[in-house]
Each structure stands twice: as structure tokens, then as C-alpha cells.
A protein has these predicted regions:
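Conserved phosphate/anionic-ligand binding catalytic regions in large, soluble enzymes, centered on
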Residues: 7-9, 85-92, 373-400, 501-520
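Preference for long, well-ordered alpha-helical segments
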Residues: 111, 121-125, 134-138, 487, ...
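Amphipathic alpha-helical interface segments
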Residues: 184-186, 438-511, 515, 527
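Polytopic transmembrane helical bundles with strong interfacial aromatic enrichment
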Residues: 356-365, 371, 479, 486, ...
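Amphipathic alpha-helix face/heptad-repeat signature
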Residues: 388-392, 420, 427-434, 473-483, ...
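A structural-propensity feature for long, helix-poor, extended segments
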Residues: 406-452, 547-556
Length: 566
């Protein structure tokens, strides 16, 4: 799985789209990065840009954008309603999928260092990327804004983490930049069956982390209680990492709870929704749906789908499409307008952009796939078919698990079978990927053979490319073997404890999985034969032989179980 991060740089220009277009063109020029949104603000004279991609590519795109902004924006002339201290005012990195905050911090600090050293721009690291606790808060780093920058740059306490520590002709033009690492922020509104902003605010105060001011006597009209420093004493709300207010939206004719979920690993979308439902019900108000503003990581939607299925005591071993559908319907995300997953889920947006114009075997229907296999084209071949057999084996195992989870009289065992279904589904997903991966590996070998070979240098480069491609084409079917064999554990469990009416389906799953193992191993052997590295080739063949023998034994064991029950 690819690591994905989001980057949300804020540029101190919101009126001249010619400048903004030049900055965003730098981002678009980096392969592997998707420009999600460009949001200029005239009053703030500021544009918020959102991009997503793999970490290295996003950092490269961010660097190029910061460089272009430093060339085009003159902070000496800047005026706007929003706090700012640089041409690129802030540049936070946000982990999206398959990457930790700790890794994101390292990328943020590396980006900050590069901006400071190569562009000679003062850089402050904030939030999780901060080197000291007092610099975690962006407002503290930006105190006094651009106008106070000259004094702060040379200050012992507030000099930048990277870049020049003086205000000269260049830094006076560029200002400073704050580079940070923060959690993904989800802007999320919950719809109410009321037009009352006051009642919506009451619910917002119930749930938001900050809560509401403590009062003497009457909780609504009583005098606000102050602490020894004269600040309001607050009664915390029920949800951590949540900011919320109530408002009335004239366009929809309803009041909403407008929330910023600042850390969805602490309070998820579905947890926030359910808590608002509870607090609204306490006040005689009904939640009718919700609205997602902006984009959301795939995991957040899948987690929501699983959460609502578990509440129903239903199996969660279903497709991503089904989980998203459950999430949308349960949260009422389609109440105000249709919810389009391909335009709202970050990974899907990036996937569609990266795969534009490409054709995939897994997108074909059964007739098309069979015809493509039967054609005179050498791919897809046995490797892709082996992977697909494994995918069908895990699909059958998952089907038996789901049928068992929902079997009448087995209600108390729903979670046991749901867990098996999730495992089976995970293998199916991986093996489906291997269908195209195997064909891609074959095509990579063909591309390597097509390289020029006129000079000695070209011949050497071509030979190395062939070796690299052949090694990759050996590793791909070996991964297929392992997935096929590992999924047999789910098949066996379903033969043993699953719905007895479906035991023969488990048997067919065993046959398909074993065939997937042996078929993939044939590809391992034929590709390994072309490797110069005989030690590696012999090792992978030896390991493959052991997997084949284990798969054959597992098939025998499963079929014995199946035959004993029919």
C-alpha cells in the first residue's frame, strides 16, 4: 500500500489569479501529486491549496510551490484580513494513509530544512514538527505577524529553526514560512430538524472539547464564573479534539452543528455523529443527516461502515463499496445532495487521476477477461490466472463466513465469523491486485528487452534492466503463492466450523487456492531460470517448493473435512 500525505500550503495572495496559477502549475508538474483544491480569498488576500500524493513527491511539489511564491509575492506590499508572516505563510503536512505521524514529522522537518537552506527563507517548525513545546502553537510562532518579523528573526528565543536570522532585502520580500505536521482535519456538519441557532449552539457546546462557560445558578443566564486570572471557567464537552458551533444555513433551511474534527484518531466521524444524536435527542431535537465539507481519508469511511455494521451485529467482511454505502446511509451524508465517493475520498481522487486513460484487467467483466486471456496477446497469462484463482478461493471462504455470521440460530457467533470474513476479504483484495501486477511484471520484462543495444553502455544498461525486471517478475508470483496458501487457513476454518450447507463451497475454495499456489510457482521457476543471481534463484525456488507441499497437504486436509460432511 502506498504511503499518502496531504499538504495544505497557504499563500499570501488571494486576488491575482495569474500569480496563483503559476504557483499551482508547479504542483501540477510533479508526477504522483494530485492538486485537490485551490481556494482563494479576496478579503484575506490568501489562497489555501490542497494537494495529496506520496511523501517524497508532495514535498517536492511543496518546495517548488514555495520557491515560485517567493519569486512572485512581495510581502512588503501585502495586506489582508488573515494573520500572516510570509509569502508561503504555512505549509503543513498531514498523514493520510499507511504513514505514521512520526514519519510525517521527519518529512516536514526535511522540507523545512531544504526551504531554509536552498531558498534562504526563514522557517519555523510548528505543531508536531516543532523542536520545542513553545513552538507547537502556530499563533505563537507567528506572533506580531510580518510586521514583527525583523525583531523576531534576530531574537535568541524566536529565531527561525532553519534559514537566515536577519531581515534583509530578500527576507523582507519573502517573509517567513511555518512548516508543520498535523493530524487530518475533517470539516463535518450534522443536520438538525430545527431552525434554532440557539438550540444548535447548545448541542455544540455539549459536545465540543472546550465545552461551555460555567455559570452561577441558572446555567443559561447566570453569571459566568471566573478563575483567579479572570478567565472563564469552562465545563468541558464530551468529545476530545472537536471544535463546534451551531448555525443556521439559509440555503438548506435548517440549523447544523458545524464541527472541525482535528484528530479523527481520537474522535472519529461516526463517534461525533452518534454523540450529537444523543445530545440532540436529550433536547428534543432529531438529527436528520450530515454533510462532509471537503475530502476525507478512505479509512475514516471504512471505519464508519464497520462501526454501523457492528452495531447491527452484521459481518464486516464485505467490500469497500458496501462499507462506504453503509457509512453514507447511516450518517445521512446524501441528505442535502448526492455523496460521490470518487470526489470525496482522497485515495479515490488520487487513484482516478493517476490511472486516467489506463486499462486494468480487474475492471473487465467475465466475458472480457476470458476473451482477453484467450487472445494472441501473451498477457494475461498463467500468473494472472493463478492470482485470480486465489482471489476466487478467498471469495468463497469469505462467502461461507458471511453466510455463517448471519445464519439463524448462530446469532451469538456473528462476530467470530465476521472476523474470519474480514481475513478472507483482505486476502481477496491482495490477490485481485496481483492479477494486474503479474501482467505488469511481464510487460516490464518486454519493455526491458526492447531497450537499445547498439553501444556497450546500452547493452550493459539493457542487461541490467532485464535482470531487474526478471527478478521483479519472480517476486510477484511468489507473493501470489503466499497469499493463496495463507487464504487456505480461512478456507479450512470455514470447512470445519462454517455453515454446513456451504461446506462444498469451502472445498472448491481449497481446490482453487491450491491451483493458485502451484500455478504461481510455475511462473516463479520459469522467471528465476533467467536470473544471473543463482543464489537468489535457488533460494526462492526452494522456498516455493515448500509452500507447494504445504498447500497440497492443506488441500488434502480440507477435502477430507468436506467429504466427511457430505
Amino acid at each position: 500500500m502506498k504511503k499518502l500525505i496531504e499538504c495544505v500550503p497557504n499563500f499570501s495572495e488571494g486576488n491575482d489569479m495569474h500569480i496563483i496559477d503559476q504557483i499551482t502549475a508547479e504542483i501540477k508538474a510533479v508526477e504522483g501529486v494530485s492538486l485537490i483544491d485551490v481556494d482563494p480569498g479576496k478579503a484575506t488576500n490568501r489562497t489555501v491549496v490542497t494537494m495529496v500524493g506520496t511523501p517524497e513527491e508532495v514535498c517536492e511539489a511543496a518546495f517548488r510551490a514555495v520557491k515560485k511564491a517567493s519569486e512572485l509575492i512581495d510581502m512588503k506590499k501585502h495586506k489582508g484580513a488573515h494573520p500572516r508572516f510570509g509569502a508561503t505563510d504555512v505549509c503543513p503536512l498531514v498523514p493520510v494513509s499507511n504513514i505514521t505521524m512520526e514519519e510525517t514529522v521527519e518529512y516536514a522537518r526535511a522540507l523545512a530544512k531544504r526551504i531554509g537552506e536552498e531558498l534562504n527563507i526563514p522557517v519555523y517548525c510548528y505543531e508536531n514538527a516543532a523542536f520545542t513545546p513553545e513552538r507547537r502553537n502556530l499563533a505563537t510562532c507567528r506572533a506580531g505577524e510580518y510586521e514583527a518579523l525583523g525583531e523576531r528573526l534576530s531574537s535568541e528565543q524566536w529565531h527561525p529553526d532553519f534559514g537566515p536570522r536577519e531581515l534583509n532585502e530578500w527576507t523582507a520580500k519573502t517573509g517567513a514560512t511555518a512548516v508543520g505536521a498535523r493530524n487530518f482535519l475533517v470539516a463535518y456538519n450534522v443536520n438538525l430538524n430545527t431552525t434554532s441557532t440557539r438550540r444548535a449552539n447548545a448541542i455544540a457546546f455539549d459536545v465540543r472539547e472546550r465545552g461551555r462557560a460555567k455559570r452561577e445558578g441558572n446555567p443559561i443566564t447566570g453569571k459566568i464564573v471566573k478563575d483567579e486570572k479572570g478567565k472563564n471557567v469552562m465545563i468541558p464537552g464530551t468529545l476530545k479534539s472537536v471544535k463546534a458551533i451551531g448555525w443556521f444555513i439559509e440555503e438548506y433551511g435548517i440549523a447544523q452543528i458545524s464541527m472541525n474534527l482535528t484528530d479523527i484518531s481520537v474522535t472519529s466521524v461516526h463517534e461525533a455523529f452518534d454523540e450529537v444524536c444523543r445530545k440532540a435527542q436529550d433536547r428534543g431535537i432529531r438529527v436528520t443527516g450530515s454533510e462532509l465539507v471537503g475530502v476525507i481519508p478512505l479509512k475514516a469511511m471504512l471505519d464508519a461502515g464497520r462501526y454501523f455494521l457492528r452495531k447491527q451485529q452484521r459481518s464486516t467482511g464485505v467490500s469497500d463499496k458496501e462499507l462506504i454505502k453503509i457509512a453514507v446511509k447511516s450518517l445521512g451524508l446524501d441528505e442535502l445532495y448526492p455523496f460521490e465517493p470518487r470526489k470525496k475520498i482522497i485515495e479515490y481522487i488520487l487513484e482516478d487521476e493517476m490511472n486516467q486513460g489506463k486499462k486494468f484487467l480487474i475492471d473487465m467483466n467475465l466475458h472480457e477477461f476470458a476473451d482477453e486471456t484467450a487472445s494472441e496477446s501473451p498477457a494475461p497469462g498463467g500468473g494472472s490466472i493463478s492470482a485470480y484463482m486465489g482471489a476466487l478461493a478467498s471469495s468463497l471462504a469469505t462467502m461461507v463466513a458471511n453466510l455463517s455470521s448471519h445464519k439463524r440460530g448462530w446469532d451469538e457467533r456473528w462476530e467470530e465469523f465476521s472476523n474470519w470474513a474480514e481475513r478472507g476479504k483482505a486476502y481477496q483484495v491482495e490477490l485481485i491486485k496481483m492479477v494486474d501486477e503479474d501482467t505488469n511484471a511481464f510487460n516490464r520484462i518486454m519493455d526491458a528487452f526492447g531497450l537499445p543495444k547498439k553501444t556497450d553502455e546500452e547493452k550493459a544498461a539493457r542487461h541490467q534492466a532485464i535482470q531487474d525486471a526478471t527478478k521483479f517478475a519472480t517476486e510477484v508470483p511468489f507473493k501470489t503463492m503466499m497469499f493463496c496458501y495463507e487464504c487456505m487457513e480461512v478456507v479450512k476454518a470455514m470447512a470445519e466450523i462454517g455453515n454446513p450447507n456451504s461446506v462444498t463451497d469451502a472445498g472448491v475454495g481449497a481446490l482453487a487456492a491450491r491451483s493458485g499456489v502451484i500455478g504461481a510457482f510455475l511462473n516463479v521457476k520459469i522467471n528465476a531460470a533467467g536470473l544471473d543471481d543463482k543464489e537468489y534463484a535457488n533460494d526462492i525456488i526452494s522456498r516455493g517448493e515448500k509452500v507447494v507441499e504445504m498447500a497440497k497437504q492443506m488441500e488434502t486436509d480440507i477435502l477430507n473435512i468436506v467429504n466427511s460432511k457430505i
